[in-house]
UniProtKB/Swiss-Prot annotation:
Catalytic residues identified in the record: 107 (schiff-base intermediate with dxp)
Principal location: cytoplasm
CDD domains linked: ThiG
Oligomeric form and interacting partners: Homotetramer. Forms heterodimers with either ThiH or ThiS.
Location(s), subcellular: Cytoplasm
Keywords, in A-Z order: Cytoplasm, Schiff base, Thiamine biosynthesis, Transferase
Name of the protein described by the UniProt record: Thiazole synthase
GO CC aspect terms: cytoplasm
Binding site for 1-deoxy-D-xylulose 5-phosphate: 168, 194-195, 216-217
Reaction catalysis annotation: [ThiS sulfur-carrier protein]-C-terminal-Gly-aminoethanethioate + 2-iminoacetate + 1-deoxy-D-xylulose 5-phosphate = [ThiS sulfur-carrier protein]-C-terminal Gly-Gly + 2-[(2R,5Z)-2-carboxy-4-methylthiazol-5(2H)-ylidene]ethyl phosphate + 2 H2O + H(+)
Amino acid sequence: MSCDEKAATSSDEPLRIGGLRLTSRLIMGTGGSTSMDTLERALVASGTQLTTVAMRRFAAGPRQSVFEILQRHRITALPNTAGCYTARDAILTANLAREALDTNLVKLEVIADEDTLLPDPVELVNAAEQLVANDFVVLAYTNDDPAIAKRLEDLGCAAVMPAGAPIGTGLGILNPHNIELIVDRANVPVILDAGIGTASEATLAMELGCDAVLLASAVTRAHNPVGMAQAMKMAVVAGRMARTSGRIPRRRLARASSPFDGIITGRVRGPRENDSL
C-alpha cells in the first residue's frame, strides 16, 4: 500500500463512541436556527450523522420537527443537558431524555454562569460519575483543562469535549496547546466543542488531533448556513487527512525544496554570512 493510500485509509477510519460508528467526524447542533427548512438543508449539506438537541426545549410544537428531520435523514439524536447549572438538574434531564428518546446517549453540559457558558467542573464531574454509574454513554462538555478532561475519562465518559472558546463566541481555539495536551493524554475520543467560527478553525481542531468537531452557531448563524455547512464538512475532512498524513517539522531556518546542484550563477551563502558587499 502506498503512502497516499495509507493516509487516505487512516483518515477514513470511522469514529467509534460507545456503540456508535460514525463515518462523518462533524457533529452538528441545532441551536440558533431560525428556520426548520434551512436547518434541514444545512444538516444534509454537512453530512453529519450525529446531532445534538437540547432536551429542555423538547415539547410539542415546532421543536418536534427537529426530531422528524433527524429521523427522515437517519441522523442520530444526541440529547444534551444544555441550560443545567447543577449536577442534579443535569441528571434529571438525562433521565428524561432516556425515557423520551429511548437512548443512553447524553451530551453532558453543566454550566457555571450565563455570561461565559463555561462548565462548572465540580458539578460536571459529580454528574458524570452518577450518569456513568447509571449506564449512560456520556459525552462530557468540559473546559480546556487537561486534568479535568483526564478525570472525566477516568470516571468512564465515552468522550471528552473541550471548549475551544465560550459557546457562540466564534473566537476559535484560544488555547491550542491545551487541546493538544488533552489529545495526547486521552484514550477516548476528543471532540472540539464550542467556539468555532469558520472552516479554518474546524480544520485546525482536526490538525491538533481532535477526533471530531461539534458546532452549531458557526452554521446556524452564518449568512449562508447551507454553504457554511458544506465548508465545515470539507474542513473537517481536510484537517483529519492533514493530521494523519503528517505535517513537516517546524524549522528556524529555511530549507530549499530544490537542490542547489547545477546553479549557473551566484553562490549560496550560509546563514552566518554578511549580505553586505
